[in-house]
A protein has these predicted regions:
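N-terminal cap/lid segment of alpha/beta-hydrolase-fold proteins
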Residues: 219-266
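Short beta-strand element of the alpha/beta-hydrolase
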Residues: 268-276
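Mature extracellular/secreted ectodomains of secretory-pathway proteins
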Residues: 79-84, 89-226
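Cap/lid segment of the alpha/beta-hydrolase catalytic domain
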Residues: 278, 302-335
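Short beta-strand/loop motif that positions the catalytic acidic residue
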Residues: 454, 460-462
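Alpha/beta-hydrolase active-site loop
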Residues: 323-359, 398
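Short glycine-enriched nucleophile-adjacent loop
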Residues: 348, 375-387
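Short amphipathic alpha-helix adjacent to the substrate-entry channel of hydrolases
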Residues: 283-302
Length: 645
């Protein structure tokens, strides 16, 4: 696992430092073959260090089947170098470096080959709809404008066609396939803008890796063995019944499937599970069974406007044909909390009148567990008010920097009108007395004022390698803004789907290029810990509170750590850590925004005498910190930066 401290003088990780001298020597040796004096205005020169390394990431999603492109030309300031796509294909297929790529041999390692060979496994019918929704969304034009800055000689129409056709490729989308299919003989990439674009796509990695070593160091405690007669990770003694029901909300025209888990003897609060965008009610099935086996009644509901069936056009009670402007309807951010309140109302009736389920639902004491967008649902029910002004300010920026899929998703809510927002002044449901939010997508939906309204106990999970809902903006900063009783469970190395039920996950995506998830065997310890901690957290509302309290301690969580995942549990972050979080997020946002704003500005003329410093001087840090990659020459970069300052 790559780790890096937060200090500006120690950006690279211990792992990086161990290999830096080797890579620096290679890089410097390679550059020593260049002429001592490199002109900034003459004929094309050798491409800058790292440009080819960036190439696969720059080109993802930027090509179409049609006229086959033969070469790619990368422009970095006054430098311009082209390579044959066939040479890249040969390297990807065989591992051999053809003569046309010999110049870049030091950079063509196994990670680059893996990136070139990787495919995004996607059902063409689903991919086509997803891209179509994106292109017709309020963010679509901004997205295309950003791509056009990176590919300056491509028209908006070419980019749109490219994206649409790429999503239809059978067998998945490969980067070289996208490049080869672009309808131009030579594809020109503006490296500075493309690096900035790649930076936004990979900023979650930068944030995660920059914080990982700091978190591991500062959240670690001297652990003592937990002595107890019970093990909250083991299944309880009760036999669990499961029943599926379909509830119809005629007023809102929504059909809501629910899975009920209950036992012969029921006690404690009712547990409601809300899934994330594109998932379903079975995403946390293992956790539902576990909690129910200890005598808790669990209800897992499905949101018809944002579930996996909705993506394929087969959802109950929600037609995708009504969607015109966003990845999902803006009203879904109002409907989701209302789905839960509606289900509670119906369960209350069953609790009174059903012969089978009488007394099974404690609807006056409810714990809501939400994953991803379900985390938003839970906190909205707990009193956090959607901050429309805060959201629109971010989403309507003329140079928006959209760092993660979670940001794009949350911007769908920006199309809510003030009247709609005012009509739902508060989605708070007083029956919700606890929340467990796992990898929540909340960083843009709530501001500090709205999060301060959450007074119920909250357990939040953050994964430092989560590229869907990046930990810095979506969990760590929001956690510091909660004012009630709270716990932060940090999975250092954890990803977005690490807590998902392996029986209900598509394992293809754990090895995908764009969704970097861990195999289930590496994340089992986290799911085991979640079983124990969730049970202990819910039991705090029962007479068993003191008995389960030891399982809500830092030492207990830490005992589940593995080589792949370091697990920590804290009730608060270390002093001044909020400032460190802001330092991790804001400088890169400003850097990328300013880089994109420059657009196609002409490069400055001049002469560069120091080859390595000249080539590295204008590149953003995140160029060197990529998933699966090595931070090339980062030490030299920062030493030179300090000298210049």
């Amino acid at each position: 696992m790559r780790q890096s401290s937060l200090s500006s003088s120690q950006w690279t990780s211990k792992w990086t430092n161990q290999r830096m001298s080797e890579w620096s020597a290679i890089a410097c040796s390679w550059f020593s073959s260049l002429p001592e004096k490199v002109s900034w205005s003459g004929s094309p020169k050798k491409v800058a260090l790292g440009t080819l390394w960036m190439l696969p990431l720059m080109l993802g999603g930027m090509a179409t089947p049609g006229l086959a492109a033969e070469r790619v030309a990368v422009r970095l300031g006054p430098f311009k170098q082209s390579v044959a796509i066939s040479d890249l294909e040969r390297f990807a297929d065989t591992g051999e470096i053809p003569p046309g790529l010999q110049l870049y041999a030091p950079l063509l390692n196994a990670d680059v080959r893996y990136t070139l060979r990787s495919r995004l496994h996607l059902d063409p019918s689903i991919g086509d709809k997803l891209v179509e929704d994106l292109l017709h969304s309020s963010a679509g034009e901004r997205f295309l404008n950003t791509l056009q800055v990176a590919i300056p000689d491509a028209s908006p129409t070419q980019l749109q066609v490219a994206l649409m056709q790429a999503a239809k490729q059978p067998g998945g989308i490969s980067l070289l396939g996208l490049l080869r299919a672009f309808p131009k003989q030579t594809v020109t990439i503006d490296a500075t803008s493309a690096i900035a674009l790649a930076s936004q796509l990979n900023l979650p990695y930068w944030q995660s890796q920059a914080l990982s070593s700091v978190l591991e160091r500062e959240l670690t405690v001297k652990s003592q063995p937990i002595r107890s007669s019970i093990d909250p990770t083991k299944a309880g003694s009760y036999w669990v019944w499961k029943q599926t029901m379909v509830l119809r909300d005629y007023q809102r025209e929504r059909t809501i499937p629910v899975d009920l888990y209950w036992t012969r003897r029921t006690h404690g609060p009712l547990v409601v599970i809300s899934h994330g965008f594109g998932a379903d009610r079975r995403f946390l099935g293992y956790l539902a069974y576990h909690l129910a086996s200890h005598g808790l009644t669990v209800v897992a509901l499905e949101h018809p406007g944002s579930n996996v069936a909705w993506l394929t056009g087969n959802s109950f009670g929600q037609s995708r044909t009504t969607l015109k402007n966003n990845l999902l309807p803006a009203t879904e951010f109002l409907d989701r909390p209302q789905d839960v309140s509606f289900v509670l109302d119906r369960l209350n009736r069953l609790n009174q009148f059903s012969s089978t389920l009488h007394g099974k639902f404690n609807t006056e004491e409810v714990t809501v567990i939400g994953h991803s967008l379900g985390g938003y649902t839970a906190l909205a029910l707990a009193g956090a008010k959607l901050s429309l002004e805060h959201l629109q300010q971010f989403c309507n920026d003329p140079n928006p920097v959209v760092f993660s899929p979670a940001d794009l998703l949350q911007c769908s809510a920006a199309d809510l009108t003030n009247a709609q927002a005012d009509a739902q002044e508060s989605l708070r449901d007083p029956r919700v007395v606890q929340t467990i939010v796992l990898n929540p997508a909340i960083g843009r939906l709530f501001d500090p004022k709205s999060l301060a309204q959450v007074t119920v106990p909250t357990l939040m999970l953050a994964g430092t390698d989560d590229t869907i809902t990046p930990a810095v903006s979506q969990q760590f900063l929001p956690f510091t803004q909660l004012k009630g009783s709270k716990f932060l469970l940090t999975a250092i190395g954890g990803t977005h789907l690490s807590v998902g039920d392996p029986a209900n996950l598509n394992h293809v995506f754990t090895q995908s290029l764009f969704i970097r998830e861990r195999p289930e065997q590496e994340t089992e310890a986290l799911r085991q810990l979640l079983r124990g901690v969730s049970l202990a957290f819910v039991q705090q509302l029962t007479p068993e509170a003191n008995r389960y309290a030891p399982f809500l301690t830092a030492a207990y969580a830490q005992s589940f750590s593995s080589t792949e995942l370091k697990l920590r549990l804290n009730s608060q972050l270390p002093p001044n850590f909020s400032q460190r979080l802001k330092m991790a997020a804001l400088p890169m946002e400003q850097l990328i925004s300013s880089t994109l704003a420059k657009g196609k500005a002409e490069s400055q003329q001049g002469v560069c005498y120091n080859k390595l410093n000249c080539l590295l001087g204008g590149l953003p840090l995140v160029m060197f910190i990529l998933p699966g990659g090595v931070p090339l020459a980062a030490n030299q970069f920062f030493r030179w930066r300090r000298k210049q300052q």
